[in-house]
Amino acid sequence: MKSLSLLALAAIAPPAAVAAVVDHQVPFENRPVQGLPEKFLIQLGPEQTRWVTEDEKWALKMEGVNFFDITAEPDRGFSVKSHERIQVSFPSEVKHQTELAPLLEQLSKDNMRQNLVHFTSFHTRYYKSETGVQSATWLFEQVEEAIQDSGAAQHAVKVERFEHSWGQFSIIATIPGRTNKTVVIGAHQDSINLFLPSILPAPGADDDGSGTVTILEAFRVLLQSEAVQQGNAANTIEFHWYSAEEAGLLGSQAIFSDYSKTGRDIKAMLQQDMTGYVEGTTKAGEVESVGVITDFVDPGLTEFIKRVITGYCTIPFVLTQCGYACSDHASASRYGYPSAFVIESEFKRSNQRIHTTGDTVDLLSFDHMLQHARMTLAFAYELAFAEL
């Protein structure tokens, strides 16, 4: 997810680790040169691109700079032409409180805790690591188990791997509806320790283990609805767990690029990245809330999400911004699909221990994660039955 500043990381990590990262920086080049370290083309803004090494990627993230890695598709800018954008009218009110009431009661903090404790037990979920593949395999099995336990497999509900060249695969679970119009809920499964990504532990409890288990729990409970499970909803619902978000939104870009090329009808995408940290808000003497991102998102979808939070959560929302390419919703936007993002708090109050060994389960509130799970479940159900 979002990047910590070098100053914030220095307060958490040993000085030698900071020095090691800074010493690896080299001057930026305009293009890759034979014989030098491999370069990647990143996009730091709608009109700003740069060739960088992998070490320079991590140094930028330590300075709080977000980016797309667009090496695979350098000609695709963030801002697509207006006629290429998917235009969707979202519901003006929530309508399924009666159907959702018994489902909301089934959301379990204990399930989320148990899953997150196991998910963070992998040494790292770095997208190029062996344990990153192992963690993805475990997560895939949990999604598969939720489908089997609900009996939804007999109704064509399925989970598939979306393979990538770097090892760790993304995961896509599909709940078919009566049409191919599709609503996507996403989180990223990878983690990173910015000091030595391929070596040091990266528990990634909040970033983004919290979002991963939040949407997993919403997925599990959504399958308890016979109407959804049996394909009676108007729209198809997909749950995505992306690989390689930390490296420049690589996994989500690959998926939405594929969807664009194959003409998939994606009506909405909601990202859940960092859903568990509330201490920054409460220590500041502010009211616990969820943060609705307002920059680089679809305004209509964001307005609908405000209605969902008001209708189904027991805490309010606060409007906030996270900057360019701050999480996987930006990949959906890059390919013309309406996207939105809800984070754990106002952005400045969010977890400052991400990307270090200090991003651990004990710092998180499962009561707060339950609020995100309620929102995710309600969002999925409401849009499943909406005319989009």
Curated annotation (Swiss-Prot):
Record key words, sorted: Aminopeptidase, Disulfide bond, Glycoprotein, Hydrolase, Metal-binding, Protease, Secreted, Signal, Zinc, Zymogen
Gene Ontology molecular functions: aminopeptidase activity; metal ion binding; metalloexopeptidase activity
Localization of this protein: Secreted
Proregion span(s): 20-88
Signal peptide residues on this chain, from the entry's feature table: 1-19
GO terms of biological process kind: proteolysis
Protein origin, superkingdom: Eukaryota
Subunit structure: Monomer.
Binding site for Zn(2+) 1: H188, D207, D273
Cofactor binding note from Swiss-Prot or TrEMBL: Binds 2 Zn(2+) ions per subunit.
Gene coding for it: LAP1
A Gene Ontology term for the protein's cellular component: extracellular region
EC number, UniProt record: 3.4.11.-
Pfam entry (one): Peptidase_M28
Binding site for Zn(2+) 2: D207, E246, H355
InterPro entries found in the cross-reference section: M28_fam, Peptidase_M28
Residues annotated as glycosylated: N180
Family note: Belongs to the peptidase M28 family. M28E subfamily.
Function (record text): Extracellular aminopeptidase that allows assimilation of proteinaceous substrates.
Cofactor(s) essential for the protein: Zn(2+)
Enzyme class: hydrolase
Cystines in this chain: C322-C326
Name the record gives this protein: Leucine aminopeptidase 1
